[in-house]
């Protein structure tokens, strides 16, 4: 791959000729990839046929050359790209990370869908979960903390590295307590646990998930149900951990048994506890930050992988 360069009144113009297949990927559906590039780069990009023209001042053109070069390499190595890939490439280049090392780490596949890190921080998070007994993923909504942890849990179960998966959340959010909610226990906890079920349905066939649930191979339950237990040979995920008290956090972490792995996720900007109640997720880093076998991974709004508007909302708040 090589660019031809010509000086212009605006600075420099570079032209890259690519195959028709690569050109189609660089455009994207509805020009989505090209529009993402234009949004991120301070120069003009024009794709006509199989020729991509970049024009602007030298620093911006140089940045565009690097980003486009990475995208072309990804396409030629068999990757499908989209607007999100543009963000991944920018993040990797900014942090001197190998783009393929991030995108090629497929955590789980289901029905042809590959679940893999999309940002450098997500890749570090995946690596931390694999190498540590207890991992904390802390950051805004939409950064893939829980989803990636669940994909790793399903993969570990499939590979027989663990015998069961346990998913839990505090059942106290937005001022609601179980005792004051209508209905039986299942009806009471369902609204709190539904997001975890939604993710599981993305990763497993419904029949297999039902079988796992009936056998207790996968358990989804409120945090209160963990008290008094020792959880061996398990992959345990505590979601929405910002809504635990310090006492609940200690109780949960001491459930860890032999052959188990724990992931704790949460967003300390979305605490629903009473104002006078301390968050266990905020305190735990000060208490356990230097403890061997534990990892802490912090996400930022740059790691939000949902709709672009979600990232803007996170930034605004």
In which residue ranges do the predicted regions lie?
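Conserved helicase motor core of SF1/SF2 NTP-dependent helicases
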Residues: 51, 110-120, 127-238, 242-317
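Short amphipathic alpha-helix segments
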Residues: 21-39
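Short glycine-/aliphatic-rich beta-strand segments at the starts of folded cytosolic domains
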Residues: 6-24
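Hydrophobic side chains in well-ordered alpha-helices
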Residues: 33, 63-67, 249-252
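Interdomain "pre-motor" coupling segment immediately N-terminal to P-loop NTPase/helicase cores
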Residues: 46-102
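Proteins enriched for Cys/Gly/acidic motifs involved in redox and nucleic-acid/cofactor modification
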Residues: 87-118, 126, 130
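Accessory nucleic-acid engagement/destabilization modules that flank
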Residues: 1-4
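Compact, well-ordered interaction domains used in eukaryotic information-processing assemblies
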Residues: 35, 41-44, 50
């Amino acid at each position: 791959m090589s660019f031809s360069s010509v000086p212009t009144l605006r600075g420099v113009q570079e032209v890259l000729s690519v195959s028709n297949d690569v050109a189609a990927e660089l455009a994207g559906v509805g020009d989505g990839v090209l529009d993402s590039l234009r949004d991120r780069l301070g120069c003009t990009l024009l794709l006509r046929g199989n020729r991509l023209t970049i024009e602007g001042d030298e620093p911006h053109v140089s940045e565009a050359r690097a980003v486009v070069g990475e995208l072309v390499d990804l396409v030629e190595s068999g990757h499908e790209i989209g607007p999100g890939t543009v963000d991944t490439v920018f993040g990797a280049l900014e942090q001197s990370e190998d783009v393929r090392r991030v995108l090629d780490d497929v955590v789980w596949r289901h029905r042809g869908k590959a679940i893999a890190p999309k940002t450098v921080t997500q890749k570090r998070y995946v690596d931390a979960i694999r190498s540590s007994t207890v991992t904390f993923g802390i950051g805004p909504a939409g950064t893939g903390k829980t989803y990636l942890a669940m994909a790793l849990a399903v993969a570990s179960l499939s590979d027989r590295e663990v015998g069961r998966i346990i998913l839990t959340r505090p059942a106290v959010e937005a001022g609601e307590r179980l005792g004051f909610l209508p209905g039986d226990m299942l009806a009471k906890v369902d609204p709190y646990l539904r997001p975890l079920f939604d993710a599981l349905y993305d990763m497993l066939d419904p029949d297999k998930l039902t079988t796992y649930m009936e056998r207790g191979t996968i358990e989804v339950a409120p945090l209160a149900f963990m008290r008094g237990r020792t959880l061996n040979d398990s992959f345990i995920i505590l979601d929405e951990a910002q809504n635990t008290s310090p006492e609940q956090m200690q109780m949960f972490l001491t459930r860890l048994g032999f052959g188990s792995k724990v992931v704790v996720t949460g967003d300390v900007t979305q605490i629903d506890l009473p104002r006078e109640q301390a968050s266990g997720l905020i305190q735990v880093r000060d208490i356990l930050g230097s403890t061997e076998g534990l990892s802490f991974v912090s996400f930022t709004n740059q790691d939000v992988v949902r709709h672009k508007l979600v990232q803007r909302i996170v930034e605004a708040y």
